[in-house]
C-alpha cells in the first residue's frame, strides 16, 4: 500500500475485497501522504478474456464499487480536501496481449482529480506509463531527474 507498509493479497478471487478493506483501514488510521493501491484487475481479465470485451467492462464496473469505498475512506479520514487521486494502468492492450508498438498498447488511461486539479478537463496528449512518475514528482514538488523521458501534464492544474 505504501513505501512504509506492504500488503499481500490472498489470490485473485479474494484480492479486490481484501485489498480494498486493507486500504480503507490504512487510509482511516494512517492518513498517508502518498499511497499506491494496485488492483490485479482489470489486468487479469484483459489477459484472459481480452481487453475491450464485455468481461473486461464488467470487471471495471465491479472495480468502481471498490474505488467508491476508497474515496469514502479518504473523506472519513478527513483528508479529502488535500488529496489528489490518480487512476491509471500499467499498459494498454489489444485482444489478450500488450507490449507492441501501437498506441492502443502503449497509451494508458489517466484520470486525475482533487486539490488544485481542473474539473472536467480532458487530457489531449497521449499518456504513457513513464509519464505517471513525472506527474507524481511534479505534484510532490520534486525535481525530475534529467534521464527521465516522462513529462508532467501541467495543464490539468489550476
Describe the residue ranges of each PLM region:
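Active-site His/acidic residue clusters
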Residues: 1, 21-65, 69
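Active-site-proximal alpha/beta segments of enzymes that process anionic O-linked groups
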Residues: 1-30, 132, 138, 152-156
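Soluble non-cytosolic domains of exported or imported proteins
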Residues: 10-17, 54-64, 123-130, 147
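Surface-exposed acidic, glycine-flexible loop patches that form ligand/cofactor-binding
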Residues: 25-28, 75-79, 144
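Loop/turn elements at helix/coil->beta-strand transitions in domains of secreted/extracellular proteins
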Residues: 30-35, 79-85, 115
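Solvent-exposed loop/turn segments at secondary-structure junctions
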Residues: 41-45, 91-94, 116-118
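Metal-dependent active-site segment of extracytoplasmic phospho-/sulfohydrolases and closely related
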Residues: 59-103, 110, 136
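Substrate-binding rim/cap in mid-to-C-terminal beta-strand-loop elements of soluble/periplasmic
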Residues: 101-143, 154
Amino acid at each position: 500500500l505504501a513505501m512504509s507498509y506492504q500488503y499481500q493479497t490472498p489470490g485473485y478471487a479474494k484480492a479486490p475485497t481484501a485489498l480494498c478493506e486493507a486500504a480503507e483501514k490504512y487510509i482511516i488510521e494512517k492518513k498517508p501522504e502518498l499511497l499506491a493501491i494496485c488492483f490485479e484487475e482489470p489486468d487479469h481479465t484483459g489477459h484472459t478474456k481480452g481487453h475491450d470485451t464485455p468481461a473486461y467492462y464488467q470487471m471495471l464496473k465491479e472495480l468502481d464499487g471498490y474505488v467508491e469505498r476508497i474515496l469514502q475512506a479518504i473523506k472519513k479520514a478527513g483528508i479529502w480536501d488535500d488529496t489528489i487521486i490518480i487512476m491509471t494502468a500499467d499498459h494498454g492492450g489489444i485482444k489478450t496481449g500488450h507490449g507492441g508498438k501501437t498506441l492502443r498498447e502503449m497509451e494508458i488511461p489517466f484520470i486525475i482529480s482533487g486539490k488544485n486539479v481542473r474539473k472536467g478537463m480532458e487530457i489531449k496528449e497521449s499518456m504513457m506509463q513513464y509519464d505517471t512518475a513525472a506527474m507524481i514528482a511534479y505534484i510532490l514538488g520534486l525535481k525530475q531527474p534529467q534521464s527521465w523521458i516522462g513529462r508532467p501534464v501541467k495543464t490539468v492544474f489550476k
